[in-house]
Amino acid sequence: PLIEDFNMKMFVSFIQADGYNPLSINGSTFEIEDKEYARNLVTELFGDDEEFQHIIGNHFTPGSIINTIANKKIKVDLTDDELFDKIFKYAKQNYEAHFAEGYWIDHWTYILDLVENYQAVYPDKMKEKLFLDKEFMYFDSPVYILPRDEKICLTKDNKIRRFGSLLHNDEEKVEKLDMNVYASNWLKDENENTIKTNLFGKLFVLATTKIANLDPYGLGLEMEADKPGWNDAMNGLPGLFGSGVSETIELKRVVTFLQNNFDSNYDIDVPIELVKFVEKLVNLLSQDTSDFVYWDKANTYKEIYRKEIRFYTLGNKSISMDLVKEALNLYAKKLDLAIEKAYEFGNGIYPTYLVYEVTKFEEILENGKAKIGNYGLPTVKALEFSMRLLPFYLEAPARALKVMDNPIEKRKMFEKIKASNIYDYDLKFYKTSEFLDQESNEIGRGRSFTKGWQERESNFLH
């Protein structure tokens, strides 16, 4: 209870306007925004010490203050508690993180757990936190997720793969915004105002960006940004147009939460560009289109949105709650169908990982020559895919138990899993997956592991 909303607010703020998040979370720093007060405070406590003027005039930590006092052998006529009371009286706490590498497809799935934990302890404060607290920010990484015509490429052995999905660093963005790539940066408008919203708005932005990530068969969420989920040993899947059903299931949880907590008496502010994105998706989802057409058009809308917010947003806009309600209903319908189809493809067990093969494509030309993408290979436009399931993993079925309403169906799936190669009858343990012997090393380093080692066919806690 003492934590209150700190963890929730910090991690929700780390979600970017594109739905992804930085990898490395750093310790918080503190800052005194009233610089004149900060200068006078340093003079009062430490005289005209220039080093302390620099430390307290910028982002600092308690450790940086104590260490400087110790290293310079400065005598202070206050206890540590008294000293910090003075310094932190007007200090603001800053969330700190940096991009580091890659965008994992499942980091955001833990956000709802934090929200539900807060709701369990403070149910009476949930409405206020969802709608009235408008201090949730958007992290901004020095990275750009490239469109398909930069990352779907033809390899030297004539295979179609998805490589080089990220522009890292996006040097144009770093220079234009004067970004510190090792510190926190936040989405701003043209006038350098930090963009903020409420919790409901942030979760709605998250849901919108993720619904546009459904794969060509409308089953899993695509590994479109160079990384898989927590199971890093499946690091080959992004190149194989891999997708995850676990994330589809978790997205349904988010959408259901938003539907259950929807209240038209409040409003939400979102980036102006997102409103257009939502309108396009609502129109698309209202049509009877094939899964491939949805994949193609949703990706196009998503790429336009990302391009529009690459450097900054034009500002916040209050989005119609009628539009939000309609969008959520359509998102839920699309996800219900995705989850139902995944269950059918798995014949009663939810598949965790899917991979796709491009079966029809056309070359992309630039000035009459093959366009070379970010990975240094010729790029192509995918026109048709075939899909196959990887051997069953335990993850998607385990997550599915959170959203399955029918206890009979839960029991059926449980019995099927226990009768499958996911269960080790000798050790009486569930394993991470079935046997991977028939898979190639291209799925990731997990295939090369000895059985039972780390993530391969092991009793593994993460």
What are the language-model segments listed below?
Residues 1-462:
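Acidic, mature catalytic/reactive cores of soluble proteins
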